[in-house]
Amino acid sequence: MNKIVFAVIGAGWRAEFFLRIAAMLPDLFEVSRVLVRNEAKADRFQKKWGIPSVTTLDQFLEKRDYSYAIISVPWDANPNYIAEMSKQGIPVLAETPPAPDIDGLLKLHEELPSNAKVEIAEQYLYQPMHAARIRLARSGILGEVSHVQVSAAHGYHGISLIRELLGVGYEKAKITGHQLTSPIVKGPDRQGLPESEEKVQSVQELAIFQFGVKTAVFDFSNVQYFSWIRGDRILVRGDRGEIVNDEATYLKDFRTPITSLLRRIDTGHGGNLEGYAHRGIQFESEMIYENRFESGRLSDDEIAVATSMYKMGLYALDLGPSFYSFAKAAQDHYLSLMMKRSIKEGQEVVTEIMPWSSR
């Protein structure tokens, strides 16, 4: 296919992910323009990235030489831009979440045209190992999956993994949440490495979700993304097997258990001269995940973001299906907000079937 051409609204830390990926995959992606409201920042941005920068929405809309618009702005600005682009007939890939709160989600649901092409850039489902686990969970090898435990991402990100691994939709859920604190030696953060040893408090959110007969445990600590000593944990259980992190155990028949690894395949290790890249995830004799962006030498999170960008390019041109719709994103954020309500109130909450479930 031809290059996927997109435009970007926003110039923050997260917006640069999309520009960096486009720069690393120039045969696949091209950035048409970036909307930066502040003139001085727009000038700096254009010099840094070599991409035309505009400062008004009218300028952004003046020449529609892009297939879709990426919206990467603060939470409170996100719904207005999503609604405006949709009314203009422009396909949208918006950052998570689509609106800050439940009222905002409901309002945006009402405002969006029925034919709006709005997808949300939830990348965790497309990180290589998560994508491999999801595929294995859906393959039937574990039997019917009825329980998962996810400690890999905060809020709606973690819940998106829970719902995909469990295979649940928009049904009601019972949620019981708790918050725990514990001391930890401070590690790196967005600003870089720690300059001295410092003990801080880690805040951990725990919640049990009940979707009828299916259950899940959400577990995430606020230091987990950067900490060297707080790792991710994933458990997926079916009636014929389970996945524990990168190991799957299943029944070949009722008396023959098999244990196999989800094995990461990378190039560039040791004497391998192909150059460093992630190739895919192998399970037994099959590559259950293959990285289509191997030439870009991307990190796992960049691979995941690039996957959303690629899928959006296909969807915008009617060459592929919806992949993470407004409705899916709204449901994940709704469940996250209800989890926080349970934590705050110290009691079980019960969710409702929301209007976007029929979208």
PLM region spans:
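Rossmann-like dinucleotide-binding domain that binds NAD(P)(H)
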Residues: 144-235, 357
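C-terminal helix-rich "cap/oligomerization" subdomain common to oxidoreductases
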Residues: 3, 68-70, 287-359
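C-terminal glycine/acidic-rich active-site capping loop/insertion
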Residues: 198, 234-235, 240-323
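Short, well-ordered coil/turn residues at beta-beta hairpins
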Residues: 72, 95, 219-220, 238
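Beta-strand-loop-alpha-helix segment that lines the small-molecule cofactor/substrate pocket
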Residues: 63, 68, 73-75, 79-125
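Rossmann-like NAD(P)H-binding beta-loop-alpha module
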Residues: 128-147, 158
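N-terminal Rossmann-like dinucleotide-binding module
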Residues: 1-49
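Short acidic low-complexity segments
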Residues: 52-64
